[in-house]
């Protein structure tokens, strides 16, 4: 009987701790939204992703925060470095499988090395894991950014990004100031 009471108490305590944590998280999110609003930025959503490529000084990075705004994307790396890409600088965005990315790399080999590029070995296996691919101009150079969040989540990010970019393009830019 005493064990049952201890187990029930444990679950009650866990329930209240979880409830308080959710409230604190919501309050922090609201406060962050207000702080960005003061800077003229309108936070829409954020995700934690695994970044594979896109920025020269970084290799594969876990727990990169992808922050979506109404006019830009910010990649927050190591909780301090922020890489900002304005929607006007995004040339292409889509979900691609690993096979499609490998094919794209093979085409780059041909472009760089001509016919000799065809002889270079690459991965031969067929893999259909999905990634988010964004081609954008970052600091004057074309950046091919590849990241993933997980099955189903990649599509959610692309849909949200598509909606935001569409709204951005339909916006009357002459009445809005877009900050860098």
PLM-predicted stretches and their roles:
Residues 61-63, 80, 127-132:
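Short, surface-exposed coil-to-beta transition loops
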Residues 65-74, 88, 139-140:
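Short, solvent-exposed coil/turn segments at beta-strand boundaries
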Residues 63-65, 82, 92:
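Short, surface-exposed charged micro-motifs
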Residues 69, 76-77, 135, 146:
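Beta-strand residues in well-ordered beta-sheet regions across diverse protein folds
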Residues 73, 84-101:
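Phosphoinositide-dependent membrane-docking surfaces
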Residues 2-72:
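Anionic N-terminal interaction surfaces
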Residues 93-180:
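Acidic, Ser/Thr- and proline-rich intrinsically disordered linker/docking segments
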Residues 61, 78-80, 137-142:
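Glycine-centered tight beta-turn/hairpin loop motif at sheet-sheet or coil-to-beta transitions
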């Amino acid at each position: 009987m005493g064990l049952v009471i201890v187990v029930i108490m444990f679950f009650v305590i866990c329930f209240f701790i979880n409830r308080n944590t959710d409230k604190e998280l919501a309050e922090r999110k609201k406060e962050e939204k207000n702080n960005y609003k003061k800077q003229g930025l309108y936070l829409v959503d954020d995700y934690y992703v695994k970044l594979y490529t896109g920025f020269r000084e970084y290799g594969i990075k876990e727990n990169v925060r992808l922050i979506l705004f109404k006019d830009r994307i910010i990649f927050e790396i190591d909780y301090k470095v922020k890489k900002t890409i304005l929607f006007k600088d995004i040339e292409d965005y889509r979900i691609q499988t690993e096979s499609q990315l490998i094919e794209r790399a093979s085409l780059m080999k041909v472009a760089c090395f001509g016919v000799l590029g065809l002889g270079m070995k690459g991965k031969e296996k067929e893999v259909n894991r999905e990634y988010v691919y964004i081609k954008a101009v970052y600091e004057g150079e074309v950046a091919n950014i590849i990241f993933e969040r997980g099955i189903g989540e990649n599509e959610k990010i692309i849909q949200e990004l598509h909606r935001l970019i569409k709204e951005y393009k339909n916006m009357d830019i002459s009445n809005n100031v877009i900050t860098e």
